[in-house]
């Protein structure tokens, strides 16, 4: 026996909130194995029967890690976000829980997160942080490339910026997209042209929302 150390606490595996299958028999949970070097940190999805009749088994394993699992209404597919095969930002993938490789659904330059299945299982609702003034995917892609090509990464603020917990937010705003889970489908920005309600922020500036946006399908 020994005293708990800083390393024990920091390097302990961390679990995300479980995603229950529609029949309640299975739970998928994200398991993050921390590391002092962020590049060595691993986050994968595991599945376990809710009655405890069998040990958990790993569903995914990739260097980029996976997160935000969501079951399809019929319980045969799992949507999640990940960076795979050269993805520069997280995209939505769909995995058949009966076997096979995960398939990429989204290819947005601004990435995708928080996927939600439509009641019929044919489409996914998700969030992407778009650039101000960009009305199309091509414009968002150009803005993302321009930012990537910069030879500097300093940020200059002339007033106190919006802060979300432990990181500074940039000028992008969350928008809501829908896309069919089918080959060659395209994402549609449901909030395009919508003016977000502004609220007072730090230093008297105005902010429109945060990095979080919540949405749900009607039955």
Where are these regions (language model features)?
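Hydrophobic beta-strand positions in blades of beta-propellers and related beta-sheet-rich domains
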Residues: 45-47, 92-94, 176-178
């Amino acid at each position: 026996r020994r005293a708990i150390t800083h390393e024990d606490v920091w390097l302990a595996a961390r679990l995300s909130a479980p995603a229950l299958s529609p029949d309640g028999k299975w739970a998928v949970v994200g398991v993050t194995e921390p590391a002092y070097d962020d590049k060595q940190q691993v986050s994968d999805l595991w599945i376990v029967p809710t009655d405890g009749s069998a040990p958990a088994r790993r569903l995914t394993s990739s260097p980029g890690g996976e997160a935000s699992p969501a079951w399809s209404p019929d319980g045969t597919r799992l949507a999640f976000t990940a960076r795979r095969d050269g993805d520069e930002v997280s995209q939505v993938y769909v995995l058949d829980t009966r076997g096979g490789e995960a398939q990429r659904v989204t290819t947005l330059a601004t990435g995708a997160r928080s996927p939600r299945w439509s009641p019929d299982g044919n489409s996914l609702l998700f969030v992407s942080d778009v650039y101000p003034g960009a009305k199309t995917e091509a414009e968002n892609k150009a803005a993302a490339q321009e930012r990537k090509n910069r030879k500097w990464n300093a940020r200059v603020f002339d007033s106190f910026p919006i802060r979300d917990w432990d990181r500074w937010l940039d000028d992008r705003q969350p928008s809501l997209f829908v896309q069919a889970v089918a080959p060659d489908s395209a994402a549609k920005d449901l909030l395009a042209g919508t003016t977000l309600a502004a609220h007072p922020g730090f230093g008297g500036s105005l902010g429109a929302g945060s990095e979080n946006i919540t949405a749900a399908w009607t039955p």
